[in-house]
Every structure is written in C-alpha cells, then in structure tokens.
C-alpha cells in the first residue's frame, strides 16, 4: 500500500471531515510514527492487552503479523480519510470482520486509547494537543464507521 502523501496546508480540504491543516497534522505525524512502525505496533498491542487482558485470546495470528495488519490499515486510513466514500465501505467491511473475531463495541474506545498513548510515546514532545485531537477525531470516525457496519 502506498505511503500517504503529505498534504499542503494551504490546499483546501476536499471533504467536511478535516481541514487541510488537520490533514497535514495527521499525515505528517503518521510519517514519524510509521518510521517506527514495528515498535509502534508492538507498543499498541502491549497497551491494549494491559488495558483489557481478555482481548488477547481474540488474536489468533502472531503479533508481528498483527502489527503489519495494523500499520497497513493505518496507512490506508491516512491515505483515504479525505475520501469517506472510499474509506467508509472499507471500514464497514473491517467492522464486520472484527465482529466475527469477537470484538465488541466497547473495545473500540480501548483501542483508541491504546493508539493515542502509543502515538504519544512515539512522538514525545511532538505529540502536541492539536495532533492528539486530530488523531482522536480520525480514530473516532474509524471506530464509528466500523461499529456501524451493515450485516
């Protein structure tokens, strides 16, 4: 999957979800997170399983494979977030798969929390309140789209 391009802050946003500035913050911060993708993925799962140990048995593949799947999903989300007509059906399909794995609606907030904590650790002082907020908005959009899948 292609890396998400860095958006010019001056270019107008093409949707109502995020301003061009927010897209820039999302994509530029993700580029820094992606540079440490293996660490970020492992850190995320460690945090998730610490928050809710009962989730660990839902994962039937190696943590390395899960990490790659997570980062590939984040790549796609970051690359397509300005096109909800493309992104939403993919998220709904992912939501259906996650239901089959045993994921329930309350688990999404735990995943958001674990991701935000992970991003904060990876980015350090670079995880500004604005970057935190844009990631929270993006992850909430992702979670809502996944939870609202059509059976």
Model-assigned labels for residue ranges:
Residues 2-151:
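Globin-like tetrapyrrole-binding proteins
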């Amino acid at each position: 999957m292609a890396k998400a391009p860095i958006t010019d802050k001056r270019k107008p946003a093409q949707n109502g979800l995020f301003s061009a500035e927010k897209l820039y913050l999302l994509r530029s911060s993700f580029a820094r997170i992606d540079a440490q993708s293996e660490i970020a993925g492992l850190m995320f799962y460690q945090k998730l399983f610490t928050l809710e140990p009962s989730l660990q048995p839902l994962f039937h593949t190696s943590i390395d494979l899960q990490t790659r799947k997570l980062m590939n999903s984040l790549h796609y989300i970051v690359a397509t977030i300005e096109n909800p007509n493309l992104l939403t059906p993919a998220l709904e399909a992912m939501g259906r798969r996650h239901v089959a794995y045993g994921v329930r609606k309350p688990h999404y907030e735990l995943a958001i929390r674990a991701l935000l904590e992970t991003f904060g650790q990876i980015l350090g002082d670079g995880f500004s309140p604005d970057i935190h907020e844009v990631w929270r908005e993006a992850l909430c959009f992702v979670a809502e789209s996944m939870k609202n899948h059509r059976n």
